[in-house]
């Protein structure tokens, strides 16, 4: 029945086998996109009005990936816990991670995040401030007789060294608290329309309570209380 419905569909539907066979005969050049081709459409959160579909080109995404200065050894474990349809996760976790040769581990549910941290033992994670605050509540509720190194092993998996965060303001209090467990929290700022990172802190250059310095390909100015950004 499903096969019949597929055959009657208004759009052409390809089976996995068909796509695999087509790929065998295709050259690399035949699937190379143009820099100005639309790569994805990301919908905004609707902070200042109705949610909008943001059309990001191949060049938009590639420029952002290249401009974000993060260093990591190939094989670095990244646990992806944010939705991939958000630009922050798509670019920072997936595209930047792949460009560094990272091993991307996909979280199946926020309910399982802490469990999966102990399973995958990530080196780097992206989180929104609410996640950081929630994890700290768990740390703060633990028995005070448990050494912090042991608690960090149990909660974070023992290898977590950096959390990149954005999307909302993070109280600097949590940056200090996570540092006690050997985890560096680095804030950044961005928006979907900017592919999305505009500024970020790095391990080599950071300031607590700051969203970091603008990326090399971004120009920022303030006008009538608004932040105006131009980039590639």
Regions found by a protein language model. Name each.
Residues 221-232:
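AMP-binding/adenylate-forming core of the ANL superfamily
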Residues 1, 53-55, 80, 102-109, ...:
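Short beta-strand->loop structural element characteristic of the AMP-binding/adenylate-forming
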Residues 209-214:
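Short Gly/Pro-enriched turn/cap motifs at secondary-structure boundaries
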Residues 1-35, 139-154:
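ANL superfamily adenylate-forming
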Residues 39-65:
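Conserved AMP-binding A3 loop
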Residues 24-43, 50, 72-77:
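Conserved pre-ATP/AMP-binding loop-to-beta segment of ANL
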Residues 62-77, 84-150:
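Conserved AMP-binding/adenylation subdomain of ANL enzymes
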Residues 123-126, 136-206:
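Gly/Ser/Thr-rich phosphate-binding loop
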